[in-house]
């Protein structure tokens, strides 16, 4: 190659590198490849130092999970123990239909659970997917991490592994989750033989509240077998992230997955870098929402990467939203996103961001030495 051609090639390589760096930045300003600065002015999304534990759940169960996780951290315990405890509280709650016991099943009526856990101190991870009959998949995932050299176990293998450590098989259905699946099976198609015949569709069932076999709030939609409030389709999932007094970081993501999913479908939750990522030098991030989008964008890894480049957890979560929208809307301008991200860093900062007009402002429960609070993040790309 001539000297002139060599110079052109060199210039082309430099231009490509500049393009890649600009693309990763997504317009967020100059890219800084260094780790988080040792000192930064405290933001309004920062606890008074560490320890700190957060969850994407903002309901009463999420708050109880944070109370129990904080007891561990406040007593000098590890972030790893704290996130497992917090996740377990949510997993065993029969009223929570997004994870564990009482989660919504697949299309066959079988509840299949996914979970991942990551320990920043050892940079180790474990996960299970399509796990049946075990209420606390995050605890099984921890054993995969600590007692094997594997990262993920799936299906029957995951169940056999759990049984070998003494986990008891249990029916994961509650009356509410089973009724929701039976209703979906009856109503998901008008071309099969499930459900009441046309002439009985609005006739009240015996013992119901009189709204009709297929009537929900407002007279249309759904009702449960007991006439309770219906359980709507959802993506499920909760994240629990913590940093302890030694400034070690850990995280858990756990889910019952997409409601009525195809048997064996696995979302982002058990995939390290997608549904969960932890870097002990930086922080942690977790995702909820449409898992397929999160997998393709490696969203949790990307959030931690952005925090390592100097972004706050809030800014990094917003960057992940922008990344997904940028990729999808290049192909389909009508892309309708539905993701939520939460993140923390070692300095005690936290943030949350979501997108899609089917979500309100994203909320997360935060517990630190300052007490318990429910934080509202930002919502983007609602139209």
Q: PLM features: what roles do these ranges have?
A:
Residues 3-27:
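N-terminal secretory signal peptides and thylakoid transit peptides that target proteins
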Residues 34-36:
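N-terminal signal peptide c-region/cleavage motif recognized by signal peptidases
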């Amino acid at each position: 190659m001539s000297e002139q051609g060599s110079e052109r090639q060199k210039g082309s390589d430099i231009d490509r590198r500049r393009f890649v760096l600009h693309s990763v930045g997504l317009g967020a300003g100059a890219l800084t490849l260094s780790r988080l600065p040792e000192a930064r002015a405290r933001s309004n999304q920062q606890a008074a130092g560490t320890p700190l534990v957060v969850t994407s759940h903002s309901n009463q169960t999420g708050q109880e999970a944070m109370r129990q996780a904080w007891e561990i951290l406040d007593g000098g315990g590890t972030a790893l123990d704290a996130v497992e405890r917090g996740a377990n509280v949510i997993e065993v709650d029969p009223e929570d239909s997004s994870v564990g016991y009482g989660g919504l099943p697949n299309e066959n009526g079988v509840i299949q659970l996914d979970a991942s856990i990551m320990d920043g101190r050892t940079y180790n991870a474990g996960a299970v997917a399509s796990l049946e009959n075990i209420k606390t998949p995050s605890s099984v995932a921890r054993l995969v991490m600590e007692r094997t050299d594997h990262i993920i176990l799936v299906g029957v293998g995951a169940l056999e592994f759990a049984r070998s450590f003494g986990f008891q098989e249990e029916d994961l259905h509650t009356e509410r989750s089973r009724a929701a699946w039976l209703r979906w099976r009856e109503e998901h198609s008008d071309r099969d033989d499930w459900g009441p015949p046309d002439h009985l569709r609005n006739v009240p069932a015996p013992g119901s509240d009189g709204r009709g076999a297929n009537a929900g709030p407002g007279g249309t939609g759904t009702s449960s077998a007991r006439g309770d409030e219906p359980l709507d389709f959802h993506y499920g999932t909760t994240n629990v992230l913590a940093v302890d007094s030694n400034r070690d970081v850990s995280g858990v993501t756990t889910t019952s997955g997409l409601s009525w999913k195809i048997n064996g479908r696995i979302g982002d939750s058990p995939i390290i870098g997608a549904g969960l990522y932890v870097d002990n030098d930086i922080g942690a991030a977790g995702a909820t929402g449409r898992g397929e989008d999160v997998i393709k964008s490696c969203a949790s890894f990307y959030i931690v990467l952005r925090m390592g480049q100097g972004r706050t957890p809030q800014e990094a979560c917003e960057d992940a939203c922008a990344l997904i929208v940028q990729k999808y809307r290049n192909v389909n301008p009508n892309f309708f996103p539905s993701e939520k991200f939460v993140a923390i860093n070692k300095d005690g900062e936290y943030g949350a961001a979501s997108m899609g007009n089917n979500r309100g402002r994203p909320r997360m429960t935060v517990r630190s030495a300052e007490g318990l609070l429910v934080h509202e993040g930002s919502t983007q790309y609602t139209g």
